[in-house]
């Protein structure tokens, strides 16, 4: 069985995946995000790359740290940072989890450029103090010609992000190849 994961190369490095070929469809690059986090009580990481590109891990010791799901929590754990995750991974589950922290908390959301605003919009609507920092960007490749043949024998293609799915269907998809698709969220599934 041939399984292709389209996750960016520098994410989930801590997970050993046997029998899964990683073929990234975009790169991640660092964005400068110098920020004093001393005034924040709660820090939310929206993705594994937001953890990996964050410059202030040592300053999280006295903060309430939240992760969007188990992958992001694992990434924080490899850096020695304890975090809470929702019972149901994703924005809706996280809203329920952070509801009790809203009153007196000041939130910092760490995410990639162009990342979802669902949590920040929710916190603002609830009257919370919230700031967002974008510490990485997703960069499309200039061409997909050379990697498209790597998908010809894929039984399954995994999409960890909507961008990966968009790129795949715009640049690589061949209706003559009978691959099945796996998504990590209902939002990506709805797109696929």
Residues covered by each model-derived region:
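Signature of uroporphyrinogen-III synthase
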Residues: 1-192
């Amino acid at each position: 069985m041939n399984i292709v994961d389209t996750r960016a190369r520098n994410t989930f490095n801590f997970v050993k995946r046997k029998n899964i070929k990683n073929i990234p469809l975009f790169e991640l690059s660092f964005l400068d995000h110098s920020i004093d986090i001393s005034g924040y009580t709660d820090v939310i990481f929206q993705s594994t790359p937001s953890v990996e590109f964050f410059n202030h891990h040592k300053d999280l010791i006295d903060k309430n740290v939240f992760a969007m799901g188990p992958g992001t929590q694992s990434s924080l754990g490899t850096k020695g940072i304890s975090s809470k995750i929702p019972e149901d991974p994703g924005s809706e589950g996280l809203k329920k989890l952070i509801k009790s922290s809203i009153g007196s908390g000041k939130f910092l959301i760490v995410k990639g450029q162009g990342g979802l605003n669902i949590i920040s919009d929710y916190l603002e609507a609830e009257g919370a103090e919230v700031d967002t920092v974008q510490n990485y960007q997703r960069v499309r490749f200039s061409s997909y010609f050379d990697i498209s043949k790597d998908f010809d024998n894929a039984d399954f293609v995994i999409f960890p992000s909507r961008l990966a799915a968009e790129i795949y269907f715009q640049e690589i998809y061949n209706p003559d190849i009978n691959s099945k698709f796996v998504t990590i969220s209902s939002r990506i599934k709805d797109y696929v």
